[in-house]
Amino acid sequence: MGQELSQHERYVEQLKQALKTRGVKVKYADLLKFFDFVKDTCPWFPQEGTIDIKRWRRVGDCFQDYYNTFGPEKVPVTAFSYWNLIKELIDKKEVNPQVMAAVAQTEEILKTSSHTELTTKPSQNPDLDLISLDSDDEGAKGSSLKDKNLSCTKKPKRFPVLLTAQTSADPEDPNPSEVDWDGLEDEAAKYHNPDWPPFLTRPPPYNKATPSAPTVMAVVNPKEELKEKIAQLEEQIKLEELHQALISKLQKLKTGNETVTSPETAGGFSRTPHWPGQHIPKGKCCASREKEEQTPKDIFPVTETVDGQGQAWRHHNGFDFTVIKELKTAASQYGATAPYTLAIVESVADNWLTPTDWNTLVRAVLSGGDHLLWKSEFFENCRETAKRNQQAGNGWDFDMLTGSGNYSSTDAQMQYDPGLFAQIQAAATKAWRKLPVKGDPGASLTGVKQGPDEPFADFVHRLITTAGRIFGSAEAGVDYVKQLAYENANPACQAAIRPYRKKTDLTGYIRLCSDIGPSYQQGLAMAAAFSGQTVKDFLNNKNKEKGGCCFKCGRKGHFAKNCHEHIHNNSETKAPGLCPRCKRGKHWANECKSKTDSQGNPLPPHQGNRTEGPAPGPETSLWGGQLCSSQQKQPISKLTRATPGSAGLDLSSTSHTVLTPEMGPQALSTGIYGPLPPNTFGLILGRSSITIKGLQVYPGVIDNDYTGEIKIMAKAVNNIVTVPQGNRIAQLILLPLIETDNKVQQPYRGQGSFGSSDIYWVQPITCQKPSLTLWLDDKMFTGLIDTGADVTIIKLEDWPPNWPITDTLTNLRGIGQSNNPKQSSKYLTWRDKENNSGLIKPFVIPNLPVNLWGRDLLSQMKIMMCSPSDIVTAQMLAQGYSPGKGLGKNENGILHPIPNQGQFDKKGFGNFLTAAIDMLAPQQCAEPITWKSDEPVWVDQWPLTSEKLAAAQQLVQEQLEAGHITESNSPWNTPIFVIKKKSGKWRLLQDLRAVNATMVLMGALQPGLPSPVAIPQGYLKIIIDLKDCFFSIPLHPSDQKRFAFSLPSTNFKEPMQRFQWKVLPQRMANSPTLCQKYVATAIHKVRHAWKQMYIIHYMDDILIAGKDGQQVLQCFDQLKQELTIAGLHIAPEKIQLQDPYTYLGFELNGPKITNQKAVIRKDKLQTLNDFQKLLGDINWLRPYLKLTTADLKPLFDTLKGDSNPNSHRSLSKEALALLDKVETAIAEQFVTHINYSLPLMFLIFNTALTPTGLFWQNNPIMWVHLPASPKKVLLPYYDAIADLIILGRDHSKKYFGIEPSVIIQPYSKSQIDWLMQNTEMWPIACASYVGILDNHYPPNKLIQFCKLHAFIFPQIISKTPLNNALLVFTDGSSTGMAAYTLADTTIKFQTNLNSAQLVELQALIAVLSAFPNQPLNIYTDSAYLAHSIPLLETVAQIKHISETAKLFLQCQQLIYNRSIPFYIGHVRAHSGLPGPIAHGNQKADLATKTVASNINTNLESAQNAHTLHHLNAQTLKLMFNIPREQARQIVRQCPICATYLPVPHLGVNPRGLLPNMIWQMDVTHYSEFGNLKYIHVSIDTFSGFLLATLQTGETTKHVITHLLHCFSIIGLPKQIKTDNGPGYTSKNFQEFCSTLQIKHVTGIPYNPQGQGIVERAHLSLKTTIEKIKKGEWYPTKGTPRNILNHALFILNFLNLDDQNHSAADRFWHSNPRKQFAMVKWKDPLDNTWPWPDPVIIWGRGSVCVYSQTHDAARWLPERLVKQIPNNNQSRE
């Protein structure tokens, strides 16, 4: 801390002086406050140690983020002002011109005077070089360093740092010739930092022309000290010139092999260059060059020497085997990534090693597996470096870095530039660090835990090493490492860190735990930590006290041996008396060597240290002592008093104990056992000195009859407290026991549980019931407070009917029992009058007199039972009870519902109703499934091969051991099978299709995937994955039997083993929904408690996001608890705590959301099914990719053609190129999180074919696309934009919950007004939108592609007829004949089409082709074409529909090529109206008619009529005048009619004598019509005329609707006969018939023969429908009403009777006099013969006669009827 503060002050001092030189005066205190704010917002800044422009701009970015996050009130007013002042100071482009001139002059002097090595050395004070002035000017950079292309004869130029202090040669400094002043290795490594982001633009690491390095200067006043520095430089220049002259003279005098070298080569001829600053010409490898003596450690593969002429030569030498051996030994003994091994590797890497040398070295040192791992990592690092080199443009590619391709030879690799060697070094060492730790199989980071005696620093080192392997660098996971450094530390270190956990960083942790060693030091370390000191300082401070306390008298200033009082008191030596131990001699007890007492009883061993050996000592425990096993029981008589006048006996702990506040009250052993002396009881009180030290001793009462061990109840109040062994901490006060006559409740106490006498809680009981009124989900309930009830119970009568409840698997017991009671399906929010609230899930029981509030609710309300008695209250306080904190030892209370614990020993005593309800713990399970039928389903098990059967047996055994299945005797059975996965493992599957068919399917709870873009920007996230989610959710017990299966045996050697699933089975239709509901219920409490969190749950993936990281972790902790309670488990390896996250197929990295890398397997795309799957996946990713519909059109076109899924498909060149584009888009495109504080913009771009939408907030958020296939064949582009607006608004509300603030589309305001007036979609799209509709796009490069498509409005096709235009009429026929007429000319031609619409479209194309340059007024009788052709001008994409799309495309091209407008209008055909337009249309229509070459015969006409209408044989015979047998053969040969045989008529019904006299009415069902399956049928019994309508039901209102329709066709009947259905017998229907004066009669109940006529009509109608439904006539296909009307047309107008009359003829042209025979009949009542009357029906043995006298029909036996001739005789 002191170092950081001194550096802090030094910054401020220098900045104040620097600002003062610019005329800016600031206060020292203000700058200190400013840097305090810098430290808070940028914790990394003080550790950097330097201010330069790049770091300072990072500080500015942090300021801006802090401002955006917390607002202006959290930022000091002067923060940005001071930041700008300092930026101007350190930005060289903005420095005072005078200062710049002085610096430039200094650099010029340095350039001309740095030919020699300066003997002075820069100051080693790191605090001086705090502020650097970087130059962004390339020229300045180039001039600040020596030229790379200097002549080789010149010496290297050195630029020492400009210092403020006087520099002088230090006698202890190393020889300047041994110091490499270039010192660019570190800078080069930083320039090629492999941890840089891969796509950031940065300056090239090495410029071949002018290398540059930053000029580092201290902030000084150049004007004041420049002269002094220049004078020093001039002196050094003179010395250098003399030095160079001396060297030249000595070189001329050299003889033999003696050589005098420059200081650069003073250490030897061969050196390994360390980043030379000058360009060194490379020579060829000189193998024959004479080698001088070299030390082994300096022998490395590539070395460079400089000869006397200054020429540089490179050599390639072999490795010194001592280096390889040392590295091999270190890797074998300590591991490849041990610190010692890495140090050797780094020392080797400091030299020039070619890629081949690295590969040779690694292969020699490491094992085969590690070598391959290193090689793969090395190649990956080189690949990333090559990508950065490509951006930098320095030409160093992947082959050069790996030594492959053209650079595989050693000669080629020797010629590499120094910078390239540095990159190879960085890639190789980084790959080495990725090697696995020795003995570590690859454990996860959370598995690294500190051992009991492991030093904390070693533990942190292991954490950082593991994090480096996982994250690539330890810095990337520093927050995670810090968290685990506390969580996985041992208890001693955790206790030391805990008070400072949020106040320091990882280095602070290490400092706090530096003195914590083995267990015996832990107590001392904890005490020191909580006093804010190290152990050393803690001990030193204790030793600073002058003099100690005397152990004899307790006074300071002398020791016990010099105590005068002790000497005075013991002047007379006291002789020992009778030994209290053995009672057999006069000697001191501690000198007693007897093993038995005077009675012969064995004596316990001595306590304390003895000469025979070390004392046994108590067992030591950190968290509380236990009585040593060797320590014997001590009676009360062994206790001592502190002084003769002490009232109490001293109690002490038998072991060293450390107590923390988190532990709560602990029982400390004393080794003292009861009973107490007769007629006494004990009172335990704490010593006052102990209380001052923070140890609270709870008072306690010791009963006289208690014989167990007396313990001290103690608790650490605020800090960690160490209780040494033997220290007095409490006193036992013996008090007299007064016996009373009170009744004894229990027998002798003996060795019962430790504590005082049982306490009875006293509460006054009154006649008033303790009732309480609460609100559950805002509904008021009143109930009794029942402290004995485990759960809350609501009576069924008070429970709202619409609140869902479910059956449970528990029993409620009390005074009586309730089995499987119902419980609320969801948690309810309770609220009291004071607005306190919580969550409960009450039970619901019928016939309960009153609601009961149980402890699950009372504990949340923190209700306490208090007594007015001070004695009882004091007793409870003595037992450790603190009001408001609960009775737990941690005093933390119970804030959540009490877990229900079963009590099986309680029995009922009668009728159910209890005041204390005990509940068996419910087993949580999935909701019960609703079944269509309870009929068992049994599907036989398939036979399995021996291999598959063995695999199935093994898998079943594993599931049985896991508890997922159980043995079964269920009557249900479905087959199982096994499949082998690619990994070679088997997978067990069950065919549940038969079971799925019997269940009611649950709807999808999440119809779509959640989008990560809706997570608020800047939120911290935690993502978890539930482990085996389906197998963690129990099935409802009532459903388990339905998922049974059998395990067969070969050759039926044994009975099949039967099992059934206990958990959600896979492939069960409702498993996903049940899983989602179960998990959603489990995390409901978390959602309610953390409403500020953004929680996403999809299947087994859960994401938590929030602003505050600490709150996110707390929410995560509660989530883990709730999931654990629900039986769900989190996969530890799938907990994601930091970027990059992987979620639902996306990668979340900071604000960016990208798709995971994907490679499309083009060789697998062969069938329509393959392409359909591929396009489905691409379409799912399109909201996150910049791919338009036009881009994907080549792939969409592959889906056209044969509909067979296995039909062959192939990739076109365009589609192949598109797949590459898709891969690139997936790899490069990204979207961002939404910022809800900014306006949300929805941009619409004019892309080809269809428009494209984009949600935008300074960056893309989500792309929106219309379907690839338009909803209409011809969809205008402006209508497509309207559809996109609707889709965008829908997406905005669905994903973000808001409407877009601004919608930007391509049309101007005047164009939008036109669209609002002339289109249907635009008013709908903009309805109720209150945002801004604009056409000005934001300025951004990404938005430029919106200009790709030019939009158009109708210009060529006029909406009104043109003047002076050519009048043309077109027509087409289904025979393929097309024609158009103009004036007196008619042109017709034959086409190969058979659709009248398409033939007429051909005629229209011919007109546009024939008159391209003339205005036209075209009229057609096709309303379809008259509407479609005007749309072609604005349609961008035409839906593919066989020939239609081709003809429309051809017509559209003709329209685009026209420059003269035309008009197209519609005229009704065959209207018969006068005038030229009707005449012209008729003329064109006649031109399409063709004269048949031969006249069809009657037989052919009958066959065609039957094919179209399926007429019966009678009708065909009469209608086409063909023989009866030919008509029957036509019907028999029809494949449809052959299955419908005629049904004989077995009876007769009364019929009306006139039309509309008697109707019969009924309802029949035809399920294929869906919602319109109810067919209401009425038939006129006189004529057989049939009427029918389709209704959605059969109630009275539907019957009345049907009759009104019938009345509108044939009028009102006199009588209607129906059955006894509720729709006919209702009061409303009776009133309806009475109002219209219609007589309504019903038949015999449940006797359908009374409705025989209408029942036969049902059969005829359904038969006709079945026939025509299978035909090919266009109007009847797919439309129920058309099919029904066609059937009625056939039955009423086409079917003829033997009189050649249809039902319509009989109804409209009735002649009853010619139809009925006249008879006379005998009335059996009066024996009269009234005659003549007509016969309605002549049946078998009976006749129905219509009595004209009585105006009613009479049924008579045939013997009472006599037929008379039918003439005009009158009645007698």
From Swiss-Prot:
Write out the residue ranges of the motif PTAP/PSAP motif: 211-214
GO BP terms, alphabetized: DNA integration; DNA recombination; establishment of integrated proviral latency; proteolysis; symbiont entry into host cell; viral genome integration into host DNA; viral translational frameshifting
Q: Which residue numbers delimit the Integrase-type Zn fingers?
A: 1497-1538
Q: Which reaction does it catalyse?
A: DNA(n) + a 2'-deoxyribonucleoside 5'-triphosphate = DNA(n+1) + diphosphate; Endonucleolytic cleavage to 5'-phosphomonoester; dUTP + H2O = dUMP + diphosphate + H(+)
Q: Where is this region: Disordered?
A: 113-149, 258-282, 593-626
Q: EC annotation?
A: 3.6.1.23, 3.4.23.-, 2.7.7.49, 2.7.7.7
Task: Kindly list the positions annotated as binding Mg(2+) 1.
Answer: D1025, D1100, D1101
Cofactor list:
Mg(2+)
| Residues the record marks as site: Cleavage | 100-101, 162-163, 217-218, 300-301, 526-527, 760-761, 874-875, 912-913, 1497-1498
Please state every residue range assigned to the domain named G-patch: 868-914
Annotated motif PPXY motif, positions: 203-206
N-myristoyl glycine lipidation sites on this chain?
Answer: G2
Gene Ontology CC terms, in alphabetical order: viral nucleocapsid
**Cofactor remark from the record:** The RT polymerase active site binds 2 magnesium ions.
User: Which stretches does UniProt call biased (Polar residues)?
Assistant: 113-126
Residues recorded as binding Zn(2+), renumbered to this chain, are H1506, H1510, C1534, C1537
Zinc among keywords: yes
Keywords assigned:
Aspartyl protease, Coiled coil, DNA integration, DNA recombination, DNA-binding, DNA-directed DNA polymerase, Endonuclease, Hydrolase, Lipoprotein, Magnesium, Metal-binding, Multifunctional enzyme, Myristate, Nuclease, Nucleotidyltransferase, Protease, Repeat, RNA-binding, RNA-directed DNA polymerase, Transferase, Viral genome integration, Viral matrix protein, Viral nucleoprotein, Virion, Virus entry into host cell, Zinc, Zinc-finger
Q: Which residues bind DNA?
A: 1717-1766
Functionally, this protein is described as follows: Nucleocapsid protein p14: Nucleocapsid protein.
Q: What is this protein called?
A: Gag-Pro-Pol polyprotein
Organism source for this protein?
Simian retrovirus SRV-1
Provide the gene name from the record: pol
